[in-house]
């Protein structure tokens, strides 16, 4: 009989705020605590600040809108872009597919965040420094 494979389960609680950590130890934040639409999203050292905290708001069918605690705005694909390297920024909540994200669990208990529109992962690229 084949051994059973244990798969990690990730539970997301709506109304709870999370930090989104990159593999390099940085966290996803709104740059310069900017509250404007189009404000840059960047990686920075974790300061446990509200602009580094995110609420995963269920949008149905395992899809989420990711809302910043400080600004109340959503993680959004710039211009609804779907190609590699598309910039991610914040924008007011809208019924836009550019604001829909899927959380995919990995076997080690972590998750990957993927754009439901583009099918591409939220990825810092080669970034290792703040900014």
Residue ranges and their predicted role:
Residues 2-35, 53-82, 100-129:
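Extracellular glycan-recognition/adhesion modules and their associated mucin-like linkers
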Residues 39-45, 86-92:
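Aromatic-rich beta-strand patches that line glycan-recognition/binding surfaces
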Residues 44, 51-54, 91, 101:
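A residue-identity detector for tryptophan
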Residues 48-49, 95-96:
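Short coil/turn segments at the loop-to-beta-strand junctions that recur within blades
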């Amino acid at each position: 009989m084949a051994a059973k494979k244990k798969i990690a389960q990730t539970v997301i609680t709506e109304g709870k705020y999370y930090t989104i950590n990159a593999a390099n130890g940085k966290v996803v934040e709104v740059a310069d605590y900017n509250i404007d639409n189009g404000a840059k999203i960047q990686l920075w050292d974790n300061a446990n600040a509200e602009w580094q905290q995110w609420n995963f708001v269920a949008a149905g069918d395992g899809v989420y809108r990711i809302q910043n605690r400080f600004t109340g705005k959503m993680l959004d694909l710039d211009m609804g872009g779907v190609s590699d390297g598309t910039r991610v920024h914040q924008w007011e909540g809208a019924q836009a597919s550019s604001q829909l994200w899927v959380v995919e669990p990995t076997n080690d208990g972590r998750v990957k965040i993927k754009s439901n529109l583009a099918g591409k992962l939220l990825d810092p690229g080669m970034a290792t420094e703040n900014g």
